[in-house]
Amino acid sequence: MKYVGTWVFHSMGVMNDDFERVYLNAEEYLHSPMPYVDETDEEAVADEMKERKKMVGMQVKICGDGKLYLLSPLPEGVSQEEVDKAVSAGVINLLDGMMAGRPMPWEERDGELWYDTGIEGEVFGEKSDSWVKAIDEDGYFTFAATRFVKV
């Protein structure tokens, strides 16, 4: 059960000028170039910063009951009343004061953490496995290009 607990943002994987993946810590990521945003458009830059802040605020909660949750911070400026209404309406779920995505099953296989993304599909006509190994070679929980470290 060494995986059970809360994992917080460590770094974001981005491509450098040589098309190699490099990992940026929160401060570096927040201040890195925005190649897909018109940086002269203040509203677009503000939207991108809002998304980046949300990313660096994310957590992974691995529970002892075999469920794993991706947690996102509540949006800035949202009142408790608005949060309560959204929860009551079933629009969002809360866990540890954060918005929780759908639970994903996890299990240990040969001493390694695996979780079910729920993403099904095919690769070259073969059904792909929706289960992925969670911990990379450096010991980080990796979801897409985001690395998390256990606290």
Region roles according to the model:
Residues 1-36:
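Tryptophan-anchored aromatic micro-motifs
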